[in-house]
Amino acid sequence: MATLDISEPVFAETIENNQLVILDFWAEWCGPCKAYGPVYERVSEAFPDVVFGKINTEEQQTLAGMFGIRSIPTTIAFKEGCLLYTSPSPRDG
């Protein structure tokens, strides 16, 4: 399954209607996001039963604020609607 672009109007529905959801918070200008993005896409294809979403922090500032995103890329995971994991993604160096 390819990644989904997640926006505020579909966020709650996505979290509530899927058992496992992994979200990548990113931005166009972010160098580490550009490196992490293709890896995230490949992983999403390897796990078709998991919903992988991408949230552009520039376009979805309310969602980024809701989770206190201060560093990108940041990955968060929900299981059965509950926040399970949050972590800034690995960076080179």
Can you say where each PLM-predicted feature lies in the sequence?
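N-terminal "domain-start" segment that seeds a small globular fold
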Residues: M1-E16
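Conserved Rossmann-like nucleotide-binding pocket used by diverse enzymes
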Residues: A2, W26, V51-G53
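Conserved redox-active cysteine motifs that mediate thiol-disulfide chemistry
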Residues: F25-P38
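A short, hydrophobic beta-strand/beta-hairpin element that forms part of a small beta-sheet core
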Residues: P73-L84
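Single conserved hydrophobic/aromatic residue that forms the stacking wall/gate
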Residues: Y85-G93
